[in-house]
């Protein structure tokens, strides 16, 4: 909240976009950032101390180490690639596309679970299904829907019934809208506008004690003179 006050709306929004879209995914994998307090400071590549062990069941630790060997092998290939063909080749053909994939992962997670009028439920209010119905569907257009299997425009059904395959998601979403019109959430705002709106307005939450939920506070973007 303080950074919003000091930076002003535009700089704060750009800062949020950079932190979320560029640094957000690596920060989550390496330190569990934005993952909530349940698992503590977790690391997806190191399932033991000094990081929290709560993220991984004990039987998975061995699988994490095996996965790490695969990552080391891939990093070795990238070093060889850079030395043989130049770092520009590696960045443009591998690292750049990987960054784009990571950005889309964050966009979908951010946009479909966040909006100024969508609360986060407290413990006494939360249930799996109530939480799932707070997922938001948004319009991505035919091209992105084709490339991404409509995961953004049919995101709610992905949480309400995870076993629905992507090729039935549009039909399942139509049924969902017809059966639950009062609780199904859809925001028709174009994606780039929604992204900017959330980056500049979803700054901090406050507790609504009457109904045990967290709602977004109105941000103060007025810079100190």
How does the language model describe each region?
Residues 1-96, 166-225:
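Non-catalytic, topology-defining segments of multipass membrane proteins
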Residues 20, 77-83, 126-132, 154-163:
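Alpha-helical membrane-embedding segments
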Residues 22-37, 94-133:
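Transmembrane alpha-helical segments that form the membrane-embedded catalytic/substrate-channel core
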Residues 61, 79, 106, 146, ...:
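A generic hydrophobic-helix recognition signal that picks specific residues
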Residues 95-99, 144, 148-151:
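Membrane-embedded alpha-helical segments that form the functional core of polytopic membrane enzymes
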Residues 108-117, 148-164:
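Histidine-centered catalytic micro-motifs
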Residues 111-112, 139-140, 190-196:
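Juxtamembrane/interface motifs at transmembrane-helix termini
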Residues 127-145:
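Cytosolic juxtamembrane regulatory segments of multi-pass membrane proteins
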């Amino acid at each position: 909240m303080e950074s919003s006050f000091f930076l002003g709306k535009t700089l704060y929004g750009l800062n949020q976009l950079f932190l979320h879209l560029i640094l957000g995914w690596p920060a989550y994998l390496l330190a569990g950032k934005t993952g909530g307090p349940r698992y503590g400071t977790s690391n997806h590549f190191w399932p033991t101390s000094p990081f929290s062990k709560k993220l991984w069941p004990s039987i998975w630790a061995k699988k994490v180490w095996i996965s790490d060997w695969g990552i080391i092998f891939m990093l070795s290939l990238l070093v060889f690639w850079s030395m043989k063909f130049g770092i520009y080749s590696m960045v443009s053909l591998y690292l750049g596309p990987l960054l784009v994939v990571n950005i889309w992962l964050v966009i979908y997670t951010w946009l479909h679970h966040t909006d100024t009028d969508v609360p986060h439920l407290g413990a006494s209010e939360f249930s799996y299904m109530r939480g799932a119905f707070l997922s938001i569907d948004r319009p991505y257009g035919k091209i992105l829907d084709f490339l991404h299997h409509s995961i953004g425009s049919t995101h709610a059904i992905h949480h309400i019934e995870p076993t629905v395959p992507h090729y039935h998601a549009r039909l399942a979403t139509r049924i969902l809208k017809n059966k639950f019109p009062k609780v199904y959430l859809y925001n028709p705002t174009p994606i780039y506008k929604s992204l900017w709106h959330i980056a500049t307005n979803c700054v901090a939450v406050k507790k609504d004690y009457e109904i045990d939920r967290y709602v977004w506070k109105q941000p103060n973007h007025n810079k100190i003179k």
